[in-house]
């Protein structure tokens, strides 16, 4: 199953065939672990089967969301994306809450089916009556939970209708091109890709000339075209430049090219109130050290001193870094891969309209706890984001199902944090998602286009925003306790 779900990984780069198989085998291990956990809770601790199954499943999902670098795509909750009446659960307990309810209801249904098949051969009426009472209570719990979720969804719709018209947070232009991405792409290919993005941006600006565009968003790594942004505390010294294997004239040429590119994009929008969020590589220069970052560059023409960037915090293993890579530099050169540094903190920016946004890059929105952490930290700093923006370059995956998995995570991130989510994706799927998880507008995969999004504020509070995944952590701990006690009895008590 996992090989089929994740087959798009292999399309990015030939060494990732091994990564695709390894990741699939790793994820497959969780099924027998889940069965063992649920069985132990049910038989050893006498936890009712629906509760045992749901607890064990959520425990496994939480563990794989954190273990090593974390992988929280293709969760059971994502199967409910087509049915928005289940999604409000995520605003209280995250995607783990939806997974819990789906597994709980599935186990209740299996219990009824098993009872229906076996009741003819079961001569114990007392046992049968006890089962009926217990499973009826479980069914009632599931029905009440679903009704509350549906009520939450419809009550918010009613509130929005009563408040209409609601002033949008801003007018945001999301750009999507159909440029495939490859590790061994030539400089000419990168320049061509940049030119296509520039032309599409200018065309979209011309079509929407009557609109005041507050923000233009380019996907991950599409602005670089082989020329990175530079972050230097002071003027780079010759020693610093030597670490980069470049000369001072090279540096001046790159800086000049960056200035030209920014001016060319800005020329399509004569109003200086327009801001720009551009996916680019950044070279971070520090005395005696050079680091490469995957960043979202913020460009404010009215105040260039406020230009800055958000550096991706959660790097993709084998794509952006390789464990212990510094010990094998020759291997990195052989397969044509480098390694990046991780960012340190979330960043918030403000539009001319006054709205604040927070950015994530690539598969960062696959980790529910990371986005929740961004929102929580920024709120504590007095910079609570009104909307979330994800920039990603999914051109690696050639239109495969990986794009659908990625969009599903963005949808749940919007619901969990009760904020609209905007996705700008190279090759797709770019989308405008509201705080209920509804896709207001999206672009087809592998097609060029743009979305003119006007997201509305969603000021609702959700339990997830305050406590994050602590309920899921408790379930994970509880599901592991039978193993802990079994090991304790085996090795400690016997000794």
Language model features: what each stretch is:
Residues 1-159, 391, 398-400, 426, ...:
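Membrane-embedded alpha-helical bundles of multi-pass enzymes
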Residues 9-18, 67-91, 289-368, 372-373:
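Active-site catalytic loop in hydrolytic enzyme cores
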Residues 27, 54-55, 197, 206, ...:
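CN hydrolase (nitrilase-like) catalytic-core segments centered on the catalytic cysteine
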Residues 34, 38, 201-205, 346:
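Generic structural signal for well-ordered alpha-helices
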Residues 41, 113-116, 218, 374-378:
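Active-site catalytic pocket residues across diverse enzymes, especially alpha/beta-hydrolases
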Residues 141-208, 395-406, 411-418, 422-423, ...:
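Non-cytosolic juxtamembrane linkers/loops
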Residues 151-316, 351-353, 359, 363, ...:
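Soluble catalytic regions of membrane-associated enzymes that act on cell-envelope
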Residues 300, 353, 393, 457-459:
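Non-catalytic surface loops within mature trypsin-like serine protease
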């Amino acid at each position: 199953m996992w090989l089929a779900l994740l087959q798009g990984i292999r399309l990015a780069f030939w060494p990732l065939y091994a990564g695709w198989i390894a990741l699939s085998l790793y994820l497959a291990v969780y099924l027998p672990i889940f069965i063992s956990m649920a069985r132990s809770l049910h038989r050893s601790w006498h936890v009712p089967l629906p509760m045992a199954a749901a607890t064990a499943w959520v425990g496994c999902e939480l563990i794989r969301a954190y273990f090593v670098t974390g992988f929280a795509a293709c969760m059971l909750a994502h199967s409910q994306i087509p049915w928005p009446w289940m999604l409000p659960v995520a605003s209280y307990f995250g995607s783990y809450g939806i997974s819990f309810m789906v597994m709980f209801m599935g186990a209740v249904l299996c219990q009824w089916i098993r009872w229906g098949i076996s009741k003819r051969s079961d001569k114990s009426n007392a046992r049968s009556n006890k089962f009926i009472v217990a499973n009826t209570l479980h069914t009632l719990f599931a029905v009440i939970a679903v009704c509350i979720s549906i009520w939450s969804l419809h009550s918010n719709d009613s509130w929005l209708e009563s408040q209409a018209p609601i002033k949008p947070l801003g007018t945001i232009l999301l750009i999507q091109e159909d440029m495939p991405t490859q590790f061994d792409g030539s400089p000419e290919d990168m320049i061509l890709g940049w030119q296509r993005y520039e032309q599409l941006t200018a065309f979209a600006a011309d079509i929407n000339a009557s609109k005041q565009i507050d923000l233009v968003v380019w996907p991950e790594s599409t602005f670089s075209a082989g020329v990175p942004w530079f972050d230097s505390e002071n003027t780079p010294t010759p020693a610093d430049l030597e670490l980069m294997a470049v000369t001072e004239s090279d540096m001046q040429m790159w800086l000049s090219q960056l200035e030209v590119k920014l001016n060319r994009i800005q020329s399509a929008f004569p109003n200086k109130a327009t801001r720009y969020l551009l996916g680019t590589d950044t070279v971070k220069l520090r005395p005696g050290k050079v680091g490469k970052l995957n960043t979202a560059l913020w460009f404010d023409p009215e105040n260039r001193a406020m230009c800055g960037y958000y550096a991706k915090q959660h790097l993709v293993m084998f794509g952006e870094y390789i464990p212990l890579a510094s010990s094998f530099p020759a291997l990195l050169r052989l397969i044509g891969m480098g390694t990046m540094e991780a960012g340190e903190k979330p960043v918030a920016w403000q539009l001319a309209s006054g709205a604040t946004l927070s950015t994530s890059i690539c598969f960062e929105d696959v980790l529910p706890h990371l986005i929740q952490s961004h929102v929580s930290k920024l709120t504590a700093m007095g910079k609570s984001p009104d909307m979330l923006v994800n920039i990603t370059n999914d051109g690696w995956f050639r239109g495969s199902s990986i794009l659908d998995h990625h969009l599903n995570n963005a949808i749940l991130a919007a619901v969990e944090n009760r904020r609209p989510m905007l996705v700008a994706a190279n090759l797709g799927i770019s989308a405008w998602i509201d705080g209920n998880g509804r896709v207001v507008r999206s672009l087809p995969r592998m097609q060029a286009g743009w979305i003119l999004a006007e997201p509305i504020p969603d000021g609702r509070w959700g339990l997830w925003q305050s406590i994050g995944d602590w309920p899921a952590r408790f379930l994970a701990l509880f599901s592991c306790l039978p193993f802990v006690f079994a090991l304790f009895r085996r090795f400690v008590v016997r000794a």
